[in-house]
Structures are given as C-alpha cells and as structure tokens.
Amino acid sequence: MYPLTKPESTIHRLTRKSVRSSLLLGVRASPRLRLDWEKRRGVWERGGSEEDIMASLWIASLLLFSLFNLTVGRPIYLLPSKQDNKVKQPLQTSRPYNIAHRGSNGEIPEETAAAYMRAIEEGADFIETDILASKDGSLICFHDVILDDTTDIAKHKEFADRKRTYEVQGSNMTGYFVVDFTLDELKSLRVKQRYPFRDQQYNGKFSIITFEEFIAIALDANRIVGIYPEIKNPVFINQHVKWPHGKKFEDKFVGLLLKYGYKGAYMSEDWLKQPVFIQSFASTSLIYISNMTDSPKIFLIDDFTMPTQDTNQSYWEITSDSFLEYIRSYVVGIGPWKDTIVPPENNHLTTPSDLVDRAHAHNLQVHPYTYRNENSFLHFDFHQDPYSEYEYWLNKIGVDGLFTDFTGSLHKYQEWAAASGTDEKSAYGLLHKIALMISSYD
C-alpha cells in the first residue's frame, strides 16, 4: 500500500469519482456486489495500489451494467470506437491463441457483455460466441436452442405457454426455444450461471446481447481483439426462422460480418485489422458461405461416435485423411472436442490419437475445446493444476489455440512460459531442472 501522505494520482482521483457515482447509481445491485464495493472503497480511500484500483473500476462497470439491465428494456452499449486500428496494439500471432469460450464465463455468466469485457481485460486474443436467431430474425449470442438452463425464463409467467417440443439434431427436446421469442422478449430475460459450483452473484444482472452488440465490444477494445462466432444449429434455425427474399441464417450471419468490416483471408492485412474465425459443426454451412466471404473458417468436431448435425455422418468418418484433404479447400483449421484427440479412461489420459499430426500435415490449425479450471474437469494426470493441462496441450500435443472458460489463467500461463525462455518453456522441464539443482546440494 502507498503511505497515506503520498499525493493522490490521476487514476486515484478518477476512480474516486467513478466509485462514488457508481455506488449512487448502483443502489439496486445485489447486496453481495454492493458489499464487494464497500470493501473496494476502502482501497482507494487509503490510496491503494493501481492493481486494486483497476479491479475496483472493473466492478464499477458491472454495477453500471446492473443498473441499465434493471431499469431499461435493453441495455446500453457503446458504439464501436472510431480509433484507428493502426494505433492499437496488434493481435499477437507468435503463440497459440487464447480463445475466450463464451467470454470469461468461469467468472461471469456466459455470452454476456460483462463476460466478454472481462475476457478482453484478462488478455483474450479472441472472444468466442454462439450465434442463434430470434423469432423475428435478429441474431443473438446464446449457446442453447432452449432458454431453460441459463436464463430466468421460468420466472416469467407471461411466457408459461411458450414451452414446446421440437426435434433437434435427430432427438426430441422440450423447453422454451429461442426461435419462439422476439428480440424484445429475449431482452426482457436475465442470464444466469450454467454451473452451480461457479459464482452465482451475477445471476440476473445481465441480458442476452445481439451479434451486433458483441461485435461492438470487440471493436471498442483498446487493442485489436478477434471475434470467433459460431453458426449454431443452422439446420434447426433455418427450419424455424424465415428471412425476406429467401435469405438463410448463413446469409444474415455473413451480412453482419461484412457490414462491420470483417473480411480477408487468414493473416492478410484486412484480417489482421479485424481478426475473425467463423466456426460451425455443420460443414455444409461453411461450404455455403465460402462463396460469400474469404474470412477463415474452422470446422468443429464432436465426439467420434456422434452424427453430424447436417449430413448424418460420423465424426470418425469426417476426420479421415480424405475428408481433411477435401475440407481444407474451405477451412483453415478444425476445432475438436479435446477428448477426441486424447481419449480419457477413468479420468486418466490414454495414448493420444494422431488427429493433430494429420491435421497439421494437411496444413490445418487445431483449436480444441473446452479447458476449464475446476477439478471436476481436470484429468487426474494434471493433479488439479490447470497450468499442467495447458503445458501438456500446448507443448506436448502442439495445438494452435485453446477454447477456455478461464482466459486469465491461460494468459498468465503463456506470459510466464514466454518469460522463461525458449529452452525452458516446459513446466515439467523447469521442475526437473529445479530438482537437479536441489539434488546437487545433497
């Protein structure tokens, strides 16, 4: 802590004003959030460190989002910044990509503005989202085709008669479907954490955002941040949502990307200004949009035993060398479920498959999903240490990017690994060298 006599810095003065304003505006925020503010307030009143001050500023933004969501039908988002990308810090391309899976959703409810803002703050290279469509054709950021698991839809008695049963990817599913609600109706809902063992204090604070609002968050960042949107369940969406002039879900999706300047082949000048990867489990959608945009595309791969959602093939079949050779004409990489690369048995890793090596042989990148820090998601081999998992996948398996729920921990690992030098990037190697040093004194 600074001594009490230290002159107040500009950041302290700005934070003092911001905190007071946010506290006054945020009186309707959750008691736990207000309590956190009361603790933080003591930091700047005592002249705390800038790290603590910045943490306070971040919570200020959450309070403001909380207020907007509670008082207006639609939250307020800034328009994309007019700042020239030439003066922004460029996207790092020298190491595997840190892909914020649904934002920093290990901390904040998934696919919300706050989760994406937090991921950018934590060092994400790309913010990832799932794109679905509302009844009236607006594109939104939401993972499930039903609203039941991650919103407060059950509390909205006015929508009690909207529950339906539809066939989704060959199976019947019952719930409140996104496609049965207009954008205004979806905006009236509030998002909650998917997993009960994660922080619940932000439940009910944030609304569903649109694809355009998501893009605005990336473009308004103070450095170049890529976006990684998924064309989600295109077969289902095209069955239930209709656009004028015979347009399809994919047409609307690409149209918005082009509207906001996302274009260019991978690593081209245009792409580096506004990086984007377009992803989908439906290879037919990726092939369809290849005539509309040259932006790089990633073909997602599920469990080998699962059928594809559009062609009813097995993923085992479409990871064959012949299919990889075929799909490389349309995509720059694949995004496999990590267990398809290294199958587990009794929560222990088994022998890795050759999928990564074969993909690289076809000049395809590999971005596996999903990396989560909680013990229940870590194989025993990693001893409840997410750094060990990152080390294994980045250095032993050699993937080109990771989808993670915990952007901050992956960023810190990569910064640590880079600082340790090329000869000492391996965590296991470092531990071995330390052990040798200690043993030399025995």
Regions found by a protein language model. Name each.
Residues S9, S21-S22:
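Low-acidity, Ser/Thr- and Arg-rich intrinsically disordered low-complexity segments
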Residues D52-D442:
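Phosphate-group recognition and catalysis centered on beta-loop-alpha active-site segments
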